[in-house]
Amino acid sequence: MYSRWLLGTILLLPACAQQPYAASTSARTQVAPEQALECVKRELPKLGYKQSSLDAAEHRINATKYDTEARRADVQFRRLVNRLEVEIGPEAGGQTSIDVQGRTFAEYTTQRGPTEVEEKASAEVNDAAQKLLAACRG
């Protein structure tokens, strides 16, 4: 009985220790949070991203970019969706932190409608996050 419990635990442990899919990057700058938010809003279209939500009071912005050129050997696969989630906040000493999370989703067309499955962040979304931070670092 004990060996079955131990074997079950050993088999489930790797499933619980998965790596996070999102790629997080951050930077600190001397500009005010409002100015950093304006910079992010200005730079996102230059990177090909479309703003999908904005919380001006909390200095958060989300943007999406669709990759319709990606192909998979699955008839239900539709496209890849790259998302940038940016959160800006004041830090001690008058600095402002800019935190960017890049995420990639595979969008499938199923019987219940469009379904997104999160994948490891693509190189494209990681590159866009780095370029965004470099442009808005000040």
Residue spans for each PLM region:
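Sec-dependent signal peptide recognition
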Residues: 2-9
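Ser/Thr-rich, low-complexity intrinsically disordered terminal regions
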Residues: 17-138
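C-terminal motif of bacterial Sec signal peptides marking the signal peptidase cleavage site
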Residues: 13-15
